[in-house]
Amino acid sequence: MTTTCSKPQQPATDDRRWKALGVCLAAGFISLLDTSIVNVALPSMERGLGATEAAQAWVVSGYALTFGLALVPAGRLGDMRGRRQAFLIGLAVFTVASAACGLASSPDRLVVFRLIQGAAAGMVAPQTSGLIQQMFQGSERAKAFGLLGSVIGVSTAVGPLAGGVIIDAVGTDDGWRWVFFVNLPIGVAAFVAGLRLLPRYPATADRRERFDPLGVLLLGCGVLALMLPLVQEQQWTGREKWALLPVGAVLLGLFWVWERRQGRLGRAPLLDLNLFSMRSFTLGALISFSYFAGFTTVFFVLALFLQNAAGYSALAAGVTVLPFAVASAVGAALGGRLVVRHGRKVVVIGLSGVALGLLGIIAVLRLVPIEHFGWAAAVPMIVGGLGSGITVSPNTTLTLTRVPVKRAGAAGGVLQTGQRVGSAAGIAVVGSVYFAHLAHRGPATEALELGLLTSVGFILVALGLAVADLGERAKVPEAPEVSQAPVISEA
């Protein structure tokens, strides 16, 4: 007996969808906030918990690793068994793991709970994009992705500020604990609201359909082999770590062969490889990879420069990047409206704005004394933030708009896995450039300039891909696509 609808209908059109979206965005906010908020809490962990440099590195990189590993399998699980259930389970585990992190009595326990927290975040993320695909169409979908883009931009940029405020308010001994406890009220409220508001869509697959465990193993090991040397680039000093990159490429190649075989045999693959036959999806995923390789690294090197070279406190460093976060939220909301009419042109404009903003920060470095850098960089920060917002949500909309709803979770998982791997690769490359210049006793301003120029290089690669896709289509298709009717929960 299959659980799919025999007569698909259009998604519900009541205001409940927007409330359900608010639940998804709240969960997305705290899961993405945790990618950056802990960075400023590392000294507090060392002082209050006795965390070594290795433990601190795993607190940061372990979250990114398990986050990235969970995305595609979790997306497929949501496609098969229902996104509402997968979302709520992931959110519950994330919230409990956050509490466990804050209560950890040793560095080892903190690392273990942090790994669990990352995997739970990776389970939540693809359900959000999948639910948006199911609940909205056309211009409404673009608006919903615009709001998601605002959350992505704000949560990533505001993390250092939020962490600085918490450490400053609570103190360095226990401040790191509250960096995790801050998730609890939001997580609990989102879970309770989700029970009531998230729609119950019928599962898209037969309950007897298998999950493809070998595909999960090959993909997981391949992504792990790619990400591990990148996220541990500074801590794992031996060159042998780079041997994992070709191993990862081979494993992903085997995954590709296995998934094609599954498709030929009429079995349900973990990942529908036909997605990559869509030019919009493939180019959009590559744009996302390149963009996040450049975007994430900006906050990484700025935090290092402001706190280590310019003498800023964690709070002051967070305030410095606040204009970027605010402008990013505004840009994402604007981009969600513009993409329906102007398509990939919006992404081209956004990427150009990010590149100009970064070049403006470099100009400030050259022209303004270091003690005045914070306020002088506000204008290029705003330009870059607007560009970032205009990039992320429109690119997500264009990348996923032609993906069948029944594959939306896995497709969103692929897109976000690319973002996580891109972020790790960018930080590894830019971090190497920054630290190598400092190791040769170069000025910190020159190290930051070289790091930002490297970030600009990644952004320009994304810009080139966006320009290549300009001719693909001018607009987001407004024609409604077949979707399943939700069964509204009254719980």
Question: Model segments located where?
Answer:
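Intrinsic disorder in cytosolic terminal tails and internal cytosolic loops
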Residues: M1-R16, D469-A491
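Transmembrane-helix bundle of Major Facilitator Superfamily
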Residues: T2-R196, A436
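Transmembrane-helix signature of multi-pass solute transporters
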Residues: V93-L103, I116, A120, I186-A193, ...
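Hydrophobic transmembrane-helix bundles of small-molecule transporters
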Residues: D168-L286, G294, Y312, G451, ...
